[in-house]
Amino acid sequence: MKVLIIFAHPEPQSLNGALHRVAVEELEEQGHHVQVSDLYKMKWKSEVDREDFPNFPKDQRLDLWTASAEAYAENSLTQDVLDEQAKLRWADFVIFHFPLWWFTMPAILKGWVDRVYTYGFGHGLGEHSDKRWGDRYGEGTLTGKRAMLIVTLGGWKEHYSARGISGPIEDVLFPINHGILFYPGFEVLPPFVAFRVHKTSFDEMASTLRKRMREIEFTKPIPYRNQNDGEYSIPTLTLHESHGGDLASGFGLHTRTEVETTDVKEA
């Protein structure tokens, strides 16, 4: 497979840098073709502003949706953004690798998403009608590709459990897994999460990561619900009462239960 890694850590000799090299090495040993976007090494521009739209009139108020849509349609985005979009089209599998800082990705990686997911590429696709509400959440430009996160954090696994003070790690990462990966069409694999990294053996983390890299073609994706498959009311995009099992609210509603997943496969 063709694998793209978006790597976001400022220090090559860090734990994340070492794990990144482990992932690349293992993927290449398995015969995959790997490209890397090392955002700090690239000195990636992390803010969206007028410079992203060279042809947008300087005397006109900047409307990001309009400017983004026009620049994408005219192929007049900046070269760094065009290059990253080309990498995404090239890849079969995409990995976002980053440390969890203040419960989310580093700003430089969020800036990559803000700039690369332009209108017409990452969003703004498909018809809006009484049957469909755009091509998103399971459909979109990146449909047919797989993605996953490699995440490191200092807290204990128990801190990010169902009763942990920080909330379940599935909930913490939901805005990224569901809102950034699933939204434009990726099938999203369960993340590799290294907890309590300052107290955990590197060899243990590296061994587990190597195993995950060997299994990327066979790992089952998180069974998120596709927006336009009939489980949500349109245009309110609320889940039908007949779905969701005993869950009354929350992120868990948007993942099919084991029973629902089995029913879908047998349908």
Curated annotation (Swiss-Prot):
GO CC annotations on file: cytosol
Q: Which PANTHER family match?
A: NAD P H OXIDOREDUCTASE-RELATED (PTHR10204), NAD(P)H DEHYDROGENASE [QUINONE] 1 ISOFORM 1 (PTHR10204:SF34)
* GO molecular function term, any single one: NAD(P)H dehydrogenase (quinone) activity
**What's this protein's function?**
Ribosyldihydronicotinamide dehydrogenase-like protein; part of the tra gene cluster that produces terrestric acid. The clavatol biosynthesis cluster cla and the terrestric acid cluster tra are both involved in the production of peniphenones and penilactones. The non-reducing PKS claF is responsible for the formation of clavatol from successive condensations of 3 malonyl-CoA units, presumably with a simple acetyl-CoA starter unit, and 2 methylation steps.
Family recorded in the similarity comment: Belongs to the NAD(P)H dehydrogenase (quinone) family.
- Give the EC class as a word: oxidoreductase
Required co-factors: FAD
User: In which residues is FAD bound?
Assistant: 9, 15-16, 100-103, 152-155, 160
Keywords carried by this UniProt record: FAD, Flavoprotein, NAD, NADP, Oxidoreductase
Entry protein name: Ribosyldihydronicotinamide dehydrogenase-like protein traD
Residues annotated for substrate binding in this entry: 122-124
